Amino acid sequence: MKKTPLLRSLVLSLAMLVSLPTFAAVKKEFNVCWTIYAGWMPWGTISSSKIIDKWASKYGIKINVVQLNDYIESINQYTAGQFDGCTMTNMDALTIPAAGGVDTTALILGSYSEGNDGVVMKGKGKTLKDLKGMKVYLPELSVSHYLLVRGLEKAGLAEKDVTVVNTSDADIVSAFGTASVQVAVAWNPQLSVIKGTPNTTEVFSSSQVPGELIDMMVVNTETLKDNPALGKALTGAWYEMMGLMKAQDASALNAMAAASGTDLAGYQAQLKTTHLFYTPHDNMAFVTSPDLAKTMQRVASFSFDKGLLGEGAQSADFIGMRFPGNVTVGDASNMKLRFDDSFVKMAAAGTL
C-alpha cells in the first residue's frame, strides 16, 4: 500500500503546501473516493444502487463516490485536497494525510482485517521462527511491513533477523512464483493466490492481531466540521448497506463480487477474513474501546521507527490523536487524526 520513501516525502511536502491556505466552508457537493478491497466494496454498491443519492438528498447535498484504481494515489489525492473523503487504513491515515499536516477524521471504521493479510513461507510445517535469516518480500512501509514486525515480535525475533525486500503489491504474486523468493507478505486478493501455491505455510496472519489493521472512511476534519451533513449522509448510507449485507441481500453481494472481479463465492470467502461491523452498535463497542488508542500508539511507534511521521518528528508522539471520551495521545498542539463516534452514535440511536 506504500511506494518509495522518496514518493512519500514528496507527497508530504505537497500536502503541507496545499493544506496551509485551505479553508473549509459550507458547500453542497462533495467527492469521496475508494479503491477495491473486500471491506470497501460496499462503497461502490452504495453508489451504483443510488443509496448514497437518497441519503445525500435527505440532507440537501450531493455526494460523488468515485472509484480509483491505485490505492496510494487515492490517498495522495485526498491529502492534496482533491477529495473530501477517502478509504484508507488506520496506519496510512496517520502516515500520509495526518503526517502531511492534513487534519483528518476517521468517520467510519467499517472493518478490520481478520486474515486478509498474511505472511506465507514456502515449505510445509513452517513457523515464524523459520523466518530468521530469510529474505522477506513485501511492499515496504506498508501494513504488510507492520504485520511482519508484529509477527516477529510474537516469535521473539526482530526485524534485524530478516532482510526486507521491497516489492509492490502488483508484483508480489509473480515474485513468489520464482524459485528465489521463499517468503512473502501480502493482502487479499493477492494473498489468496499466494496461499494457493502448493507446499506453502501461512506462518502469521492478521487474525492473530485482531483490530490492528483497520479499514476506514476518513474525511477532512474542517470540511466535516463545516458540513456535518456529509458525515450524516455517508454514515447513514453505509449502515443501510451493512443491513443489506447482514441480511445476505443477493443483489448487493453479487454487485460487490462482480466489481471486485470474482464471483459470489469468491467475495464471500474474502468477507470471512474481514471483520465487518454490520451494526452501529457493534462499531460503537470497537471505536470506544481503550484498545483502539493502544493500537494507534503501537502503529505510531512503528511509523516513527520507519521515518513515516515526517522530517520534524522527534518521537512517536509527534502527531496528536483524539479518541472518543476526549482521550488523546501524542502532541495535543499537533492534533491531526481524530476518531469520531458522534455519527455512529446517531446511527445507533436511529436519529440520522
Q: Which residues does each PLM region occupy?
A:
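Conserved C-terminal helix/tail region of periplasmic/extracytoplasmic solute-binding proteins
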Residues: 301-352
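Sec/Tat-exported extracytoplasmic proteins
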Residues: 56, 82, 87-90, 97-100, ...
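Pocket-lining segment of extracytoplasmic ligand-binding domains
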Residues: 92, 165, 171-265
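Secondary-structure end/capping motifs
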Residues: 226-312
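Short, glycine-/small- and polar/acidic-enriched structural segments
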Residues: 25-166, 173, 182-188, 211, ...
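N-terminal signal peptide c-region/cleavage motif recognized by signal peptidases
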Residues: 19-21
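Short linear loop/turn motifs
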Residues: 63-64, 269-277, 314-326
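Bacterial N-terminal signal peptides that target proteins for export
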Residues: 1-11
